[in-house]
């Protein structure tokens, strides 16, 4: 398990590597990466050989993206290289199925940086760069466009961007030439309800549905996906209590496609909401809420076996481990908590030795 974190805007221990036991749900620290600033979002390559991290997020200067080679036997990371992201505050990394192309969402300078990766995991210089303008109705959060994340469709033929500031989902057609070089072509944007603030998104494994977590409205939006088009189906409240302001954060679907989870930040909330998924029509049914036993659950992950869910509580500096009931979707907290200052991103991979 790989943990990214905020280092309080100064060099520090930004990435932690743990060995996670998929029988007991216990974790043991293997290694750390020091002297990096705000390695706040991580993404594994599809083959598990490389780890990519945003660096220097939430600063007044351009952020960077770093590539690391993973030694899965020792649990060590070796820096391969870094590249400038071309904008401030990179918030998210997406990788296509081939592992050859990276999309970085820059939040403060609303833009998308598109990179190619070579066969050694090294990131080449920016291949394509797109900027965005726009605004929304929520003062402060929506004074300008804010690209928070991106997702390739399961067929790798479209890329969808969540624009928290403009209340829309930007769509790009993915083009591959004869040499398998990828380029992006801007297509229509999908407008969402004013004041929603789309943040993260996930596609269902059946390829028919997608679900977005809206930070500012505290709702999960369900969409039908057909021929690259997203059609809005319904909104579902993610919070258990009414709030003056909402701060929903992350969203994931269990490996078996039966349950959807989303994290909610905020006073008297800090919870994971649990929904069951109707695979025939994409509808969600509320199962319940589970407290995260910490403050500000920015990110969470379901382990590849589907038996555990782990939550990174950024403000309380702890990672909480839950055993997941695969039949009911409900969560049960385990005794062990991991202490990681500013924990903000989790990535998991099963290595066979």
UniProtKB/Swiss-Prot annotation:
Assigned EC number: 3.1.1.31
Catalytic activity: 6-phospho-D-glucono-1,5-lactone + H2O = 6-phospho-D-gluconate + H(+)
GO biological process: glucose metabolic process; pentose-phosphate shunt
UniProt enzyme class: hydrolase
UniProt induction comment: By ulvan and rhamnose.
Keywords, sorted A to Z: Carbohydrate metabolism, Cytoplasm, Glucose metabolism, Hydrolase
Biological pathway: Carbohydrate degradation; pentose phosphate pathway; D-ribulose 5-phosphate from D-glucose 6-phosphate (oxidative stage): step 2/3
Intracellular or extracellular location(s): Cytoplasm
GO cellular component, one term: cytoplasm
Gene Ontology molecular function: 6-phosphogluconolactonase activity
Job of this protein: Carboxylic ester hydrolase that may be involved in ulvan degradation. Ulvan is the main polysaccharide component of the Ulvales (green seaweed) cell wall. It is composed of disaccharide building blocks comprising 3-sulfated rhamnose (Rha3S) linked to D-glucuronic acid (GlcA), L-iduronic acid (IduA), or D-xylose (Xyl). Catalyzes the hydrolysis of 6-phosphogluconolactone to 6-phosphogluconate.
Similarity annotation: Belongs to the cycloisomerase 2 family.
Name recorded for this polypeptide: 6-phosphogluconolactonase
Organism: Formosa agariphila (strain DSM 15362 / KCTC 12365 / LMG 23005 / KMM 3901 / M-2Alg 35-1)
């Amino acid at each position: 398990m790989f943990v990214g974190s905020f280092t309080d805007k100064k060099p520090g221990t930004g990435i932690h590597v743990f060995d996670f036991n998929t029988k007991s749900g216990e974790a043991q620290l293997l290694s750390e990466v020091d002297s990096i600033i705000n390695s706040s979002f991580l993404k594994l390559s599809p083959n598990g050989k490389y780890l990519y991290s945003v660096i220097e997020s939430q600063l007044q200067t351009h952020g960077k993206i770093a590539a690391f080679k993973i030694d899965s036997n020792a649990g060590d990371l070796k820096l391969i290289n870094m590249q400038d992201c071309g904008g401030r505050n990179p918030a998210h990394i997406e990788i296509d199925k081939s592992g050859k192309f990276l999309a970085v969402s820059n939040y403060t300078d609303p833009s998308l940086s598109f990179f190619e990766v070579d066969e050694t995991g090294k990131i080449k210089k920016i291949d394509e760069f797109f900027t965005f303008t726009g605004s929304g109705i929520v003062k402060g959060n929506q004074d300008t466009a804010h690209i928070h994340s991106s997702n390739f469709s399961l067929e790798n033929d479209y890329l969808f961007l969540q624009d928290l500031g403009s209340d829309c989902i930007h769509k790009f057609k993915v083009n591959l030439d004869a040499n398998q070089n990828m380029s992006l072509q801007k297509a229509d944007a999908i407008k969402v309800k004013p004041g929603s603030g789309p943040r993260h998104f996930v596609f269902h494994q059946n390829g028919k549905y997608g679900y977005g977590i809206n930070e500012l409205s505290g709702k999960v939006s369900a969409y039908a996906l057909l021929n690259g088009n997203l059609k809005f189906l319904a909104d579902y409240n993610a919070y258990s209590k009414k709030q003056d302001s909402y701060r929903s954060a992350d969203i994931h679907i269990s490996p078996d496609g039966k349950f959807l989870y989303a994290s909610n930040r905020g006073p008297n909330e800090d919870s994971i909401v649990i929904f069951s998924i109707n695979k025939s029509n994409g509808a969600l049914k509320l199962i319940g809420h589970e407290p995260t036993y910490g403050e500000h659950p920015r990110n969470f992950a379901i382990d590849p076996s589907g038996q555990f869910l782990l939550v990174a509580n950024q403000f309380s500096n702890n990672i909480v481990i839950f055993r997941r009931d695969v039949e009911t979707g409900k969560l049960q907290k385990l005794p062990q908590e991991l202490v990681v200052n500013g924990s903000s991103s989790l990535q998991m991979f099963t290595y066979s030795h």
